């Protein structure tokens, strides 16, 4: 089955994310478990955890349909030891919150070297930060997101992500999330069915579909290989609808959260329906 949804608001309590997903006809969703623009957050209460789990059961959601996202402040590759420690501790807390909610994966941007150290050294710091979080949680996967490579952000290429994974001790609990806008901006041309197939063959060779634990389905306002991260509604950007038709016809993308982060929430229910249509078309 295809699990399709969007990154919905959890304002007023994490359980509201479930209700907000249902309201747009989604059977998957992403959420922040805390304010993504602040370092500290009060711990989840027993009541909040209980309400979330009850909502999940009531609406028939399982962990594999949910792709939580961590705070944008976190940079596991930060060359400054003090700032990096702050990021690692915040990442551990994010992973623990996911575990408390009965979920099994946390999506995150790997980090940036800030042009202060070699990229490879920064990637090693990221690997070590991931290990720290995995050692303090159980049953939760750290899911590395492909990036556009804006600024000094790492994870722009499949090779960089593979490098981060191979230097971690706990590789069995590391997954990957591919963002269609990001990989296009990073230089992977997926605008045609042939291009999409070629890029996914490359992904399989370098990382492997066995690690794929989610997708972010975004059209791109940014141009090809621009290394600029700008999302657009489906069919309204430089990708067009072809890659999404190809993706939805490929059974490898079933049974994982396919998450819209497109720029107009009012269109999400229509975009979900459109993707469902693509998924049922006979080729």
Question: How would you describe each model-predicted region?
Answer:
Residues 1-70, 74-96, 281-283:
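N-terminal pre-domain/capping segments
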Residues 7-11, 34-36, 71-73, 111-113, ...:
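Active-site beta-loop-alpha junctions enriched in small/polar residues
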Residues 19-25, 45-67, 93-102, 131-138, ...:
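Acidic (Asp/Glu)-rich catalytic clusters
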Residues 21, 69, 87, 98, ...:
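Conserved, mostly hydrophobic/aromatic
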Residues 27-33, 64-68, 174-180, 209-221:
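Non-cysteine beta-strand/loop elements that form the S-adenosyl-L-methionine
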Residues 76-175:
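Active-site acidic/histidine proton-transfer and metal-coordination neighborhood
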Residues 80-93, 118-131, 157-167, 194-201, ...:
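Short, electropositive alpha-helical surface patch
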Residues 117, 154-162, 184-255:
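Gly/Pro-rich active-site loop or hairpin
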